[in-house]
């Protein structure tokens, strides 16, 4: 099993969110077995916080292999499924940090507003350290709400051909293409957010690409 310091090296720093992801992953692997060599374990994460980096390192579930599935719910909930059995565990964070003092709240507000004074950095570091220590010491039953499940297996990763968008010319995974005005286009162009959409918006405002290039040159000379 991977160690916490390996996860910190991957993520870049230690923080409460990363340590929560570590604890979640340790619990999942204890229940489902060894970390995934390939796609044997599937992780469904309901947030994109620091914790997900720990999940990737600990379980070897990654976006590229298709066994790390992101649900943008903003919830501290993680579900792990074992292939081929469908055995699963759903882990919800139930832990609550100790209440902050008025001074700690003040330091955090100053930090969020951009202050990096020694006083502020020291206070923020101390608070984070206490949270990390609490997460590491708290028992599983007090840290999590657990549900053991049997789940249908998500589809394994598939490789699709790439097709050029007929508006911007960029290669796009075939099932992500859309049809607009009789043309097969990528999602950004379908929604008017792609390169072609930007060009159309510029044209409607009377702005040419030469105007943009000239503005960039002028800005570089001024800097």
Tell me what each language-model feature is.
Residues 150-162, 175-180:
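Short, flexible, mixed-charge glycine/proline-rich loop motifs
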Residues 40-84:
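A structural-propensity feature for long, helix-poor, extended segments
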Residues 165-169, 186-189:
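Short cysteine-rich clusters marking metal-coordination/redox-active sites
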Residues 142-153, 167-172:
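Short Cys/His-rich Zn2+-coordinating modules
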Residues 195-223:
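Short linear interaction segments
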Residues 179-192:
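Cysteine-rich micro-motifs
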Residues 10-24, 28:
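Conserved phosphate/anionic-ligand binding catalytic regions in large, soluble enzymes, centered on
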Residues 173, 194:
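Short functional micro-motifs and their immediate structural scaffolds
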């Amino acid at each position: 099993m991977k160690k916490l310091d390996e996860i910190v090296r991957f993520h870049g720093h230690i923080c409460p969110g990363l340590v929560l992801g570590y604890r979640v992953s340790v619990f999942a692997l204890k229940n489902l077995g060894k970390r995934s060599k390939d796609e044997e374990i599937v992780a469904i994460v309901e947030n994109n916080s620091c914790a997900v980096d720990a999940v990737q390192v600990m379980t070897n579930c990654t976006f590229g292999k298709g066994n790390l599935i992101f649900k943008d719910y903003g919830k501290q909930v993680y579900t792990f499924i074992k292939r081929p059995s469908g055995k699963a565990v759903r882990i919800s964070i139930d832990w609550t940090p100790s209440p902050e003092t008025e001074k700690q709240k003040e330091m955090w507000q100053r930090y969020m507003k951009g202050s990096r004074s020694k006083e502020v950095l020291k206070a923020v570091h101390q608070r984070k350290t206490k949270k990390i220590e609490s997460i590491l010491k708290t028992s599983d039953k007090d840290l999590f709400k657990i549900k053991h499940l049997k789940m249908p297996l998500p589809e394994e990763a598939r490789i699709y051909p790439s097709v050029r968008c007929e508006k911007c010319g960029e290669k796009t995974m075939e099932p992500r293409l859309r049809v607009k005005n009789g043309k097969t286009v990528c999602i950004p162009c379908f929604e008017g957010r792609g390169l072609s959409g930007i060009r159309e918006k510029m044209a409607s405002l009377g702005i040419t690409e030469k105007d943009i290039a000239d503005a960039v040159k002028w800005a570089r000379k001024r800097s």
